[in-house]
Amino acid sequence: MKLFKSILLIAACHAAQASAAIDINADPNLTGAAPLTGILNGQQSDTQNMSGFDNTPPPSPPVVMSRMFGAQLFNGTSADSGATVGFNPDYILNPGDSIQVRLWGAFTFDGALQVDPKGNIFLPNVGPVKVAGVSNSQLNALVTSKVKEVYQSNVNVYASLLQAQPVKVYVTGFVRNPGLYGGVTSDSLLNYLIKAGGVDPERGSYVDIVVKRGNRVRSNVNLYDFLLNGKLGLSQFADGDTIIVGPRQHTFSVQGDVFNSYDFEFRESSIPVTEALSWARPKPGATHITIMRKQGLQKRSEYYPISSAPGRMLQNGDTLIVSTDRYAGTIQVRVEGAHSGEHAMVLPYGSTMRAVLEKVRPNSMSQMNAVQLYRPSVAQRQKEMLNLSLQKLEEASLSAQSSTKEEASLRMQEAQLISRFVAKARTVVPKGEVILNESNIDSVLLEDGDVINIPEKTSLVMVHGEVLFPNAVSWQKGMTTEDYIEKCGGLTQKSGNARIIVIRQNGAAVNAEDVDSLKPGDEIMVLPKYESKNIEVTRGISTILYQLAVGAKVILSL
C-alpha cells in the first residue's frame, strides 16, 4: 500500500512539473521567454520585448548596382507580353495566329478566325484564304480581294491581326535564370531576356547574343546598338527557338567628367579611344584623358589632350579617365544687402576683398564696419564637422554601459531622445560664414561663388533660445545681456545655468561674460542645457548646440 502511494505521489509531481513547463502564460521575467498566447491565437508578436528594447530585424542591405553599361536594361523591369501586334506592319502571319474579320453590307460577318496548320482561314461563302507568309500590312488587301471575287459589290471588308501565335523560347547562356519561357511570336528579344532575369552583369555579354532556330543562326544581336543608337531588329520567334547569351568579352572602364560613367564591353581585341569617348559622352569643358593600363605586375598611365585621341586604342582591362584641366581665369561673387551697386561682380582670379569694396556703392543704411562673407566651401566643411560630431554623439549614447535593469531602461530612453535630436540636427544647413578681421579685411582672398553681404543699420537686439518670450528689443546704451533677457521674460526654469553667447553683426561669437557692452544688431543666444550621467554625451550635445548656434544661427532643443 505504501509503495502504491509512493508511485501516485511521484506521478503527481511529474504532472505538476509538466503543467508548469507548458504554462504559456508564465511570467516572462522568471522564465526568460516572451509569452506565447498572442502567437498561438494568430496574433503578431510585439517587436519589443518586456525590457523595451526593439528586436525588429535590421533592414536588408541595399542592392549594389552593377557598373556594366547595359545592366540598367534589366533593373526592376518585368516583361509584358502583348499579344496584339497590329502596330507592326512587317509582322509575317503564321499558323496559329488569330485574325479578326468583319463583313458588312449585303452580307454580314464578324468573327475571329484562326490560321490553320495549312496557313488558311475559312471565310463563310468565300472559302479558304491563304494568309500564312503574308505581312500584316498586306492582310486587309488580300482578304478584300478574295471577298470581291465572290461579292462584286455592296460588301465591305475589314481584316486585322488580333492575336499572335503563342510560342515557347529557350533562353540560355549567361543569364540569371536560364530556361523555357512562353510568349508570342511578336515578342522582342528583350522580353525574353527580361523573363530570364536579364544578362548576368558579372559574367554575361551584352554584345554577343545569338538567336538560333535548330542548328541555324538566325541573328546576332548587340544590345549596345539599341542602347546607343536605338536599333533593335524585330524578329519573329517560333516554338523551340533558342536565345544564347555568350560570355563577357573585353571590357574597359570610364570615369571622370562623362555622362556615362560605366564599364563598357567590346568584341575586338582593342577599340579606338574616339569610339569609347562617343559611348561615354564627355561633359562640356572636358579637356584631357588618362589611360591607365596594367602590364604584368606594373601599372602604366598615359595623359593626353582629348584632341589627340584619334589614333589611340584601348585594350582589355584599361581605365579611361576624362578630366577637366583648366585654370580659373576669373571668379564671380555676389554682393547682397544694403548697397546701391551691382549685385554680381566678375573679378580676376586671386582678387581680394579690397577689389569688391572699392566697387560697392553704399547707401545711408549700409553698415560697412560689419561686412559679412559667406563661402560655399566653408559651409561644406562646417557640415562635415557637424556630421562627425553627431556621429560621435550617437556612438557615445549607444555605447554607455548599465549596471542595473532600471539604469539600462533609462539609457535606452536617453538614446532614443538623442537619436531624435541627431536626426533634427542633420537637417540643419550651415551658412558658411567667414569672420572677417577689420584690421586686414582688404587682404582677404575671394573664391568663386562667395557671397558678400552688407548688413543694414538697425536699432534692435535679438534674443533667442531658452527665454520665456524670444523677441527683438530696442537697443539702449548701458543695458547688459541680463537686462535684455529680463525684457524677454527671463530664462526658462530649466536654463538656470545656461550658456549665453552674443553674436555680433559681423558674425563673431563671444561669450556673454566677456561682453562689456552690446551694440545695435547683436544677437543674444541662450543655449539649452542638457545634463546626463554620461560625461561624453553631455560634452557632445553642448558642443553641437554651440556649433549650430554659431554656424547656422539655429538653436535646437532636445
UniProtKB/Swiss-Prot annotation:
Keywords: Capsule biogenesis/degradation, Periplasm, Signal, Transport. Pfam families: Poly_export, SLBB. Residues 1-20 form the signal peptide. GO terms for cellular component: periplasmic space. It comes from the Bacteria. To E.coli K5 KpsD. This is Polysialic acid transport protein KpsD.
